[in-house]
A protein has these predicted regions:
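Thiamine diphosphate
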Residues: 1-155
């Protein structure tokens, strides 16, 4: 596992990084929402679920080399962004998949396509269902995707 908070370093434009390696599902995040992913992963690890976490860092240019590696390795992909889901990071991942004929199961978390009221970050993340609890829930439901509970979570 890579330390999430590190000293300043030069970041290559268009290159993401693996934050922690697992086998069950890949969680791709962009920006500070990755801190919530880290919290969710700690909870999932206690239940013997070991997701990989990738900090993609850039939407444009998106790290195509890293996406190829991720999509070849994992059946289940969860994208998490503190931005609009429609036309955002998750959409960029889906476009990349379509252009390259990938058929992985993908769920996108972020701000839904509706008006969101005011509140603290934690309140809004919870209301929009992309806080650490939502990330935890979606990982569980995607891995148990044949159950009816998965359909209830799809936004």
């Amino acid at each position: 596992q890579v330390e999430w908070e590190t000293e300043m370093e030069i970041i290559e434009i268009g290159k993401g990084r693996m934050v922690c390696e697992g086998d069950d599902i890949a969680i791709l995040s962009i920006g500070h929402i990755g801190n919530y992913v880290t919290k969710a992963i700690k909870k999932l690890n206690k239940e013997k679920i070991f997701p990989s976490h990738y900090d993609m860092r850039f939407v444009k240019p998106i790290d195509q080399e890293l996406l190829h590696k991720i999509l070849k390795k994992y059946k289940f992909i969860l994208t998490v962004e503190d931005g609009c889901v429609m036309g955002g990071f998750g959409s960029a991942v889906l476009e990349f998949m379509a252009e390259n004929n990938y058929t992985n199961s993908v769920q996108r978390l972020g701000i839904p396509d509706r008006i969101v009221e005011h509140g603290s970050q934690d309140e809004l993340y919870s209301e929009c269902y992309y806080d650490d609890e939502a990330i935890y829930d979606f990982c569980n439901k995607m891995l148990d995707h044949q159950g009816s509970k998965y359909e209830e979570l799809v936004i």
